[in-house]
């Protein structure tokens, strides 16, 4: 339920579970939407788009474009190489579309529970099968980005049978 990051922290505090075992959906669904839209934009299979939506799920989430890759090529380099075809304004529109997608789905269907359910199933499968898969789940940061341990936000992390096993800190540059 939303606000997912706050509810994840409340769950952590009320249960007393190890922080690695308390995982919220975070921006997992937003990241999947982002990759899908980037795949359409760059005309490539979305599985080869490596980009993340991070931060608090909702209006303040963002895409660190400096870390976005199309296969092995940085997205920002592609924009620079093909300025007549690809534009930063288009990426900003895609980012905004991802941020507001839930509102559009709720307006049309009344809720977003199918997408969320699929994302939860995918995370549970990663835990049960000890997959070491990367998700932008809502997890407690451990000092990453200079933030205190009390903060739960959507951030790339490796999830396996131990839970959110490792937080992957992105280099955030202008």
Across the structure, where does each feature detected by a protein language model lie?
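Rossmann-fold NAD(P)-binding glycine/threonine-rich loop
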Residues: 1-20
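C-terminal substrate-binding/catalytic lobe of Rossmann-fold NAD(P)-dependent dehydrogenases
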Residues: 14-21, 30-174
